[in-house]
Amino acid sequence: MQAALIGLNFPLQRRFLSGVLTTTSSAKRCYSGDTGKPYDCTSAEHKKELEECYNRLDLSFENTKEAFKSKSNTELVRALVVLRLCGIQTLVNQNQIILNTMRRVLGKNLFKKTLKNTFFGHFVAGETEEEVRHVVEKLRNYGVKSILDYSVEADITSQEATDKTVKGTSVATVKPAAMTPVVDAKTLETTRERYTVHEEFGDRRQGVSSARTYFYEGEEQCDKNRDIFKDSINAVASATKNEGFVAVKITALGRPQLLLKLSEAIVQTQNFFKALTGGMSLQEGRLTSQEFYKRLGELGVKTDTESVKKFFDEVDFDSDGIVDLHGWNHILDDHVKLGQLFQVLNIKTGSLEPLIQNLSNEEEQEFRNMVRRTLDVAEYAIEKGVRIMVDAEQTYLQPAISKITIEMMKKYNKGRGNIFNTYQAYLKGTLQNMEADMQVARREGWHFGAKLVRGAYMEQERARAKAIGYEDPINDNFEATSKMYESCLTRIADEVHRRGKTNVSVMVASHNEDTVRFALNLMKEKCISPSERVMCMAQLYGMCDQVSFSLGQAGFSVYKYLPYGPVEEVLPYLSRRALENGSVLKKANKERDLLWKELKRRISSGEFKARSSSSS
């Protein structure tokens, strides 16, 4: 899960901390923000469920007796120590040196035991499937479900990471020369630079909080990663009774540099399409056949040629006489080469030209392998009753990742939401991109599944944009990101009303209490009960327990994001978790204060172990 930034939106906080959710609509009638039509609040069962859940929930998230009832006194002490250490900036900044020194001084076995009883035990679900299953079952006893994430990554130096990135650069080129009469040269060049490997940003881990990073280590390793995802699916299936998710990163299943080229081709195609449609937004930009041919004629193209007819047939993907961007390629078609996916009409010659050129046969095969591995994981998960959550990554890789994910949703989300795409609210274009995807889902009739996060790559994204010379993709400040998050949630809730509760779902992945309260308010306002599986919450394992367990025990749908893997190989993850907690905890000490409050309460009342989930 992308890092969830913690902060206080004080007007919202005052609105909610009274312990009662207030809504602007009537208690009996809830209205859609875009239609004004009443939501269906007629189900007595769902109304009763909502009322009972809200009556059980302390919206201040300060009822420590309930929030930490799953923790033993030892676990409370461990959490306090770990979070306190994460708040000491000197220790956090030197955490890798400290860990390496401990490993050398203590020896492998004692070092491993020490970590399992401290940082590893607090932030990681376990090493083996059996250990993970025990944690999953314990969480479920307290109303919390699980998302499994195998968090092993190569422990390599920054120079080694850069070398892997530069060495793996694709020989393929995206040549948008055919677009020059339509798209201005500056736009084409800026796009090319943005989606090119730059050595100073070769280590994709730099300036990243929380998110795991994969570097390409050959096709055999990608096959191993696919099998690891399948093992995660098995673990979820055996322990969660069809309730769980597995987090998947597309960069684990193939060469990231191919995703970079694919992303450039997608964005250059968007540039061309926007120019053809007069600069319309992605969701608005649609042309009838008459408008299409008229526009080409205005550009001096002979419209009665076979090439133009073929081009129109390719971009009119559903044969409805309308051209739109979403049908311009078929990523998952195993019989179509990557070099053939993006055919662009050369305005000067009137002929079709491939946008991606000079792909070697080896690269073509690597891309097909990546697609096959992705589909293997998806189909295996569906067979086991487990859902897939595709993680978002950097903006220069995300167009390709999103396109692959949306194509998977088209293929596998016909009956229920098996595949979820991730949207990062700290990006300026998130609402527009999500709107375009929802429009396609509505038109084609498949389930739209979204995970909404704040984002994990802010520092790197801003530095890269400034150095290379393109617009900063990140919102200006925390408040703008919060506004984007809330706008996306509101828009999804309206889409639920428009399409029905079985066709749209969203996971609110956030540690921000105000964001969670906003989502809860939407559920009440739009009459969405927890059992309808439309809106759920998620937090990282070892963080924000006062929110997760309060929600779970009140009856809301909530998940913990569970990293797991061998101690030694999860150290890079633990290092980032320490860094993230350091930046968060120096601003907000609420969780630590609540843990200390609960420990003192137990000591004063003579309680020496966690209560069972069934006790009152």
Curated annotation (Swiss-Prot):
Induction: Up-regulated by infection with P.aeruginosa.
Phenotype upon gene inactivation: RNAi-mediated knockdown reduces the survival incidence, results in increased bacterial load and reduces ROS production following infection by P.aeruginosa. RNAi-mediated knockdown inhibits the nuclear accumulation of the transcription factor skn-1 and reduces the expression of skn-1 transcriptional targets including gst-4 following infection by P.aeruginosa. RNAi-mediated knockdown suppresses the pro-survival effects of the addition of exogenous proline following infection by P.aeruginosa.
Catalytic activity: L-proline + a quinone = (S)-1-pyrroline-5-carboxylate + a quinol + H(+)
Single annotated GO MF: FAD binding
Pathway: Amino-acid degradation; L-proline degradation into L-glutamate; L-glutamate from L-proline: step 1/2
Signal peptide: none
Subcellular location: Mitochondrion matrix
Assigned keywords, A-Z: FAD, Flavoprotein, Mitochondrion, Oxidoreductase, Proline metabolism, Transit peptide
Needed cofactors: FAD
Pfam assignment, any one: Pro_dh
Chief site of localization: mitochondrion
Record GO cellular component, one term: mitochondrion
Single GO BP term: proline catabolic process to glutamate
Entry-linked Gene3D superfamilies: 3.20.20.220
The family this protein is said to belong to: Belongs to the proline oxidase family.
Protein's UniProt name: Proline dehydrogenase 1, mitochondrial
Species assigned in the record: Caenorhabditis elegans
Lineage: Eukaryota, Metazoa, Ecdysozoa, Nematoda, Chromadorea
